[in-house]
């Protein structure tokens, strides 16, 4: 018995050593550093902004996509970013990997960077309320979008620009993670149970097992989208925090309905107005909850719904707030017999049916909101491992509906209808069975409290897997009863329904949406890499559009003058 145990440990150590070598490829990414707050020179509290101002672009939401979008547009134009949340400097725990759990534990006082809500499904959830958005409160996982995702969007992407844009993001806020024991153990187990091939270190969404990028550096410092503001022109950028945008201002004439500005309030309740000049635009980057909410409050939505709420209809858009999705998260928690070090997610197991990862954590006495399905879930009194399954897509979808027609600070009612689509449920069953194999692997044997076969022998925190690994009905019940949010909700302002392929709101001039509300599926196992890229990408595309338009205008007005001058000169020459 002792000999076989020692052999297993030696084999495990060899696996870990080989895995570590495979993950040691060199990649040019960001260098470990302190979080760079240089951008604070052009950040203001909304209380200190003018009551009325005019800009080339107004961006509603300084989050994952909004910050790189603003930085890019500021190269040529004046940009105002209106962020409803606070500065990350107010909450230092945001800036550390240890703070991920702490920030979920912090009570929501209406100002804290993690805003709590409970979906119509009864599932605890959170959203970012801070400059940097969810990139400032998430688990730091960085992945490029699945190649097939681009093909499914209905958009003709400039893939050369996409890749250059990823590089622009990655050389500032993305890092190659150092060795973490639990993450390497997780990778070993994934390979053992057939999540192949071993892809080493890669930022690409690839089927198999790999080490991926992180927005936490190897000192545990968080880097987020706010730092991309440093790449902008400080003379053209103005960011206002604690700025709650209440409505979009529209004008209407023979050319149609046009967004010309926004109304926002500061923390004292004072009303401000900001307008766009000339060919400028209002761009919503308020996320899958905030962007549909603001459109509805501004009179853009299903006509009968808006009328029933006594909201004046500006434009009939039946799909605003429809088709919002959230990837279900199911999991198993194990309590090892001996303490394990805490780790952040850096190793991923990817298949076509499910995405998997694991974290190890210290014990806690206060429940992190949304981490477990509900407040009654048992809490760990020792270190534990959280082994997670994510359903890709998904196909199940729900709605965003207003709870207040006058106050944007009142969160809308969001329902996701988890597992209402049978394909999603089948993917959960498949994934949780694979987690059963994961628990049965040789790599996990040292973490049992009893030497029992298969999935037995673990000290399980919370709901255990069904004992019969072939009982699909029992697994379906498990999936439904133990579901939590992966915090990767998306949709509500879909391209092809609400937006055209340039992210413009159809039927309205000078209004776009650039954020996580725009697509019906998650772009990769973890979406933040795509939306960081999207902000920069769309900023570049808009600059290109403006340049082409201005060159055409210049040509059309300049050439006739040249011809007129030439004609006069020729006439004078012939006459003389």
UniProtKB/Swiss-Prot annotation:
FAD binds at residues 64-65, 83-84, 130, 134, 138-141, 245, 487-488, 516, 527-528. Residues 1-28 form the signal peptide. Keywords: Disulfide bond, FAD, Flavoprotein, Glycoprotein, Lyase, Signal, Vacuole. It catalyses: (R)-mandelonitrile = benzaldehyde + hydrogen cyanide. Disulfide bonds join 428-479. Coiled coil: none annotated. Its EC number is 4.1.2.10. One of its GO terms (molecular function) is oxidoreductase activity, acting on CH-OH group of donors. It is found in: Vacuole, Aleurone grain. Its cofactor is FAD. Substrate binds at residues 357, 486. It is an enzyme of class 4 (lyase). The active site is at residues 488, 526. Glycans are attached at residues 31, 47, 76, 146, 151, 163, 184, 219, 268, 310, 381, 413, 421, 468. GO terms for cellular component: aleurone grain; vacuole. It holds the Pfam family GMC_oxred_C. Monomer. PANTHER family: GLUCOSE-METHANOL-CHOLINE OXIDOREDUCTASE N-TERMINAL DOMAIN-CONTAINING PROTEIN, OSJNBA0019K04.7 PROTEIN. Involved in cyanogenesis, the release of HCN from injured tissues. Catalyzes the stereospecific addition of HCN to a variety of aldehydes in vitro. It is a major seed constituent, and could have the additional role of a storage form for reduced nitrogen. Belongs to the GMC oxidoreductase family. This is (R)-mandelonitrile lyase 2. It comes from Prunus serotina.
